């Protein structure tokens, strides 16, 4: 899980999800997991 000031999709399988005011990126590739905060 990478914590970044700006999250974005890295590949086609990445999905942006908003959960409890946090923006997450969930992907089939575990390296692409990101969280904003």
Swiss-Prot record:
SUPFAM superfamilies: Ribosomal protein L36 (SSF57840)
Pfam families xref list: Ribosomal_L36
Gene Ontology CC annotation, any one: chloroplast
UniProtKB keywords: Chloroplast, Plastid, Ribonucleoprotein, Ribosomal protein
A single GO BP: translation
Protein's gene: rpl36
Molecular function terms, GO-annotated: structural constituent of ribosome
Descriptive protein name: Large ribosomal subunit protein bL36c
């Amino acid at each position: 899980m990478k914590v970044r000031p700006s999250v974005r999709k890295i590949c086609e399988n990445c999905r942006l999800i908003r959960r409890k005011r946090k923006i997450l990126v969930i992907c089939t590739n575990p390296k692409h997991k990101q969280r904003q905060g």
